[in-house]
Amino acid sequence: KFKKNLKKKNLSVLKTREPGGSKSAETIRNLIFSKTSSTFHKKTDYYLMLASRNEHLINTLLPAKKKKLIVISDRFTDSTYAYQVSGNNIDSKVNSVNKNYILNSFRPDLTIVLKSSLKMINSRLKKRKQLNKFDKLKNSFFIKVQNVFIKLAKNNKKKYFLIDTSVNNNSAEKKILEVISKKLKI
């Protein structure tokens, strides 16, 4: 929906996701979410996420930046920090080194954090046709991850924007468009 609304304003927009976002990154994504991946050690999972990000960056994000496209990505480095580093206790110093090694100076201009109630999260998960391994984690994990995102957002209000989606989904979408429009000065 955001892509469509931004295109109406004659903006060149690329929508992407992580893990995935390029042909090679999608191959890694398929491995991450395969049935056998539930037996992967947490470090293996972490490095697969980074491998996918590297492919995504090289094959999608950097070319998009060169073309001056507006990129909307469903998840990026903060998700790795929230899910793998904080959620699965991966060493944050190791993550910082790896993040800088892969991204170099590449960073998102804006991160929108969607806050939702546990009831809403579970309701959305029930509507999905197929659940992945992250969807099947305990509520305590979701709370921990969401708290990390909220803390990131509160600690850097210039880069992050926190939107409560548990109130009304339509108003959340409207607010997201307002935030993006303000950031892009359109």
Positions of predicted regions on the chain:
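Generic detector of well-ordered alpha-helical packing
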Residues: 1, 46, 75-79, 110, ...
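NTP-dependent small-molecule kinase module
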Residues: 3-5, 119-186
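ATP-dependent small-molecule kinase phosphotransfer cores
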Residues: 11-103
